[in-house]
A protein has these predicted regions:
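Extended, folded cores of ATP/NTP-driven motor/assembly subunits in large transport
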Residues: 1-406
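Glycine-rich phosphate-binding loop of nucleotide-binding enzymes
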Residues: 40, 48, 55, 62-65, ...
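Structural beta-strand/beta-sheet cores of well-ordered domains, especially the beta-sheet scaffolds
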Residues: 46-48, 83-85, 135-137, 218-238, ...
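Switch/coupling segment of Walker-type NTPase motor domains
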Residues: 56, 63, 88-99, 113-117, ...
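Conserved structured core elements
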Residues: 66, 133, 156, 333, ...
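Short, well-ordered alpha-helical packing segments
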Residues: 69, 73-77, 156-167, 186, ...
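Glycine-rich nucleotide cofactor-binding entry segment
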Residues: 385-437
Length: 553
């Protein structure tokens, strides 16, 4: 056990800090110093965070889910063994005003406002299916405190490794700077004041302001089984025991609960050589116990006694663990799952706690409250990079990866247009196609699936929400009524209509090298389509050139 205790002791040593009774609410926040590059000094550690983009995991096919799970296992295997990792999922609900600002069309005091009112009513009806939840995901690495230039170089190498490994998951990695990290804490400690958050490194550092004044609550009080801050109540829960078999939707079920909450998964990777030595010592201990038991039975002349099932099971489990480490390319990982949720009243907090515990029971897992450790639990659950609770579980890579943090990718671009509802989260799909590398779009589906209706809805949103021009090539004559309703012009082109297209017309005023030559190429291509391939020879093309020039002259 010496090697493993040494590894775990090194991680615990960096968590130990001198006990200090806070004299202000600012001192309850364990951030000692922040640097402009996003590195924080917390306790006796340096931490750095990156923002993860979500992955469409829940609605994916089984083969795709297996591929994502395998890639996530590879990402966990690549975590550095000289650092601790924390994956954090932040749930926060949009207030109604912010929610409407994102999805509703702005009125412009013109004759189209009654259409905008109707469109907003439809979008509000769709939005009622949503719980207004927005999820953000972060990965935080923490290392024992060292010189800041050394920490900066370390996190730079770690960032390159994270970008490479999470790219295989189609999940992007973006550095979370001080603004992003402090915003998470501000929104948690000061709910209802999210829009007032305003932080700038230069402004605060040049004026020697304490950044904790910006994010701390008006007051905080830790009780036996909950804590109070501002006019809110909160409670920290942790996963006490795992089931023998855990499904990959445990984290998804916990985080889809329609409340403000933060869930964190702490991981301490163990070097493979130390893990193998530890498992070997466990196997040796089990074999020794079995040998001693058999010797006692032999001394009683009981030579046919079978080894007790408990001992045999310990032998099988330890050997299976060794096979995972040595043959299946897995790693030993100490893991801890914590969750902090808030409510407006203690009664509501208790009800929410019961619901979350019930979710754990559905997965045969025991979720408990961190009694008498609410402050330590809060500092563990929040993305500081600390781990003050010690309810660790020894897992393999695959067992740890079962707590996969991905659910469904959201699409909510500021200033975008509505394109429907997310199938998993039920949140509106808001997209600004102009920001994409290729803004083109297609509606694909079987007959009767709503392609035309979706296109008409998109056209309506473009007309009502932007100044863009809309040109429709309507071969099936479906969009005439829509165009007239929005003041558009319908041009009918057919052998019997009064409108005709003249492909040989030249519109003057455009800077073009030779418009006549372009018309010559057009006539030549038309004739080539009508005649056999290669029938137009060079002499014929010369005649076409001269005739076309004479027409325009």
């Amino acid at each position: 056990m010496a090697t493993l205790i040494k590894t775990l002791a090194a991680a615990n040593q960096s968590e130990r800090v001198k006990l200090k009774i806070p004299r202000s609410v600012q001192e309850t926040i364990p951030i000692r110093r922040i640097y402009t590059n996003g590195i924080w000094e917390v306790g006796r550690k340096h931490s750095r965070s990156w923002k993860l983009t979500d992955v469409n995991y829940i609605a994916a096919s089984q083969e795709t889910q297996k591929s994502i799970f395998k890639a996530y296992c590879g990402a966990l295997n690549s975590l550095p063994t000289d650092a601790t990792a924390k994956i954090t999922i932040v749930n926060h609900r949009l207030n109604p005003a912010e929610f409407e600002r994102r999805i509703l069309l702005a009125y412009q005091d013109d004759w189209l406002d009654h259409y905008r009112e109707e469109a907003n009513r439809i979008m509000k009806g769709r939005a009622e299916q949503s719980n207004n939840l927005v999820q953000e995901r972060f990965v935080t690495l923490s290392i024992p405190q060292r010189r800041i230039d050394e920490s900066k170089a370390y996190f730079k190498r770690a960032e390159a490794n994270l970008q490479k490994t999470f790219a295989r998951l189609d999940s992007g990695i973006q550095p979370a700077m001080n603004y992003d990290r402090l915003r998470i804490l501000h929104d948690f400690f000061r709910p209802g004041y999210e829009r007032y958050f305003d932080y700038d490194d230069y402004r605060y550092m040049s004026r020697a302001k304490d950044f904790r004044n910006l994010i701390c609550p008006d007051g905080i009080c830790f009780k036996r089984n909950h804590f109070e801050f501002g006019n809110k109540f909160g409670r920290v829960l942790f996963l006490r025991t795992y089931a023998s078999f855990v499904t990959d939707d445990l984290i998804s079920d916990l985080t889809e609960y329609a409340r403000d909450l933060i869930l964190s998964i702490d991981m301490i990777p163990v070097p493979t050589d130390e893990a193998v030595k530890e498992v070997e010592s466990i196997i040796l201990g089990v074999e020794t116990d079995i040998t001693r038991w058999q010797q006692r039975q032999n001394s009683r002349n009981n030579f046919t006694a079978e080894v007790p099932r408990t001992m045999e099971q310990k032998r099988e489990n330890s050997r299976g663990y060794m096979d995972d480490l040595t043959q299946n390319d897995q790693r030993m990982i100490f893991s801890l799952i914590t969750l902090v949720h808030t409510a407006d009243s203690l009664e509501q907090l208790d009800a929410d706690t019961e619901s979350l515990i019930a979710v754990g029971k559905e997965h045969l897992c025991d979720i408990s409250s961190a009694k008498y450790q609410q402050e330590d639990g809060l500092n563990t659950a929040l993305p500081y990079g600390l781990r003050r609770l010690h309810a660790l579980h020894t897992l393999t890579t695959e067992s740890c990866a079962v707590a996969i943090p991905f659910r469904a990718q959201e699409l909510q671009d500021p200033g975008g247009l509505s394109y429907g509802i997310n199938e998993v989260s039920k949140n509106p799909l808001i997209c600004d196609r102009k920001r994409l590398v290729s803004p083109h779009a297609f509606y694909l589906g079987v007959s009767g699936s709503g392609k035309s209706m979706g296109m008409k809805s998109t056209i309506m949103n473009v007309v009502l929400g932007t100044d863009d021009d809309v040109i429709i090539v309507d071969a099936e004559r479906e969009y005439g009524t829509l165009a007239r309703a929005f003041g558009g012009e319908v041009v009918e082109i057919s052998p019997h209509s009064t409108h005709h297209l003249n492909p040989l017309e030249i519109v003057f005023g455009f800077e073009d090298e030779n418009p006549v030559a372009q018309k010559t190429e057009l006539i030549t291509s038309i004739l080539e389509q009508q005649m056999a391939n290669g029938a137009i020879k060079g002499s014929y093309k010369s005649i076409i050139d001269r005739c076309t020039a004479n027409v325009y002259n």
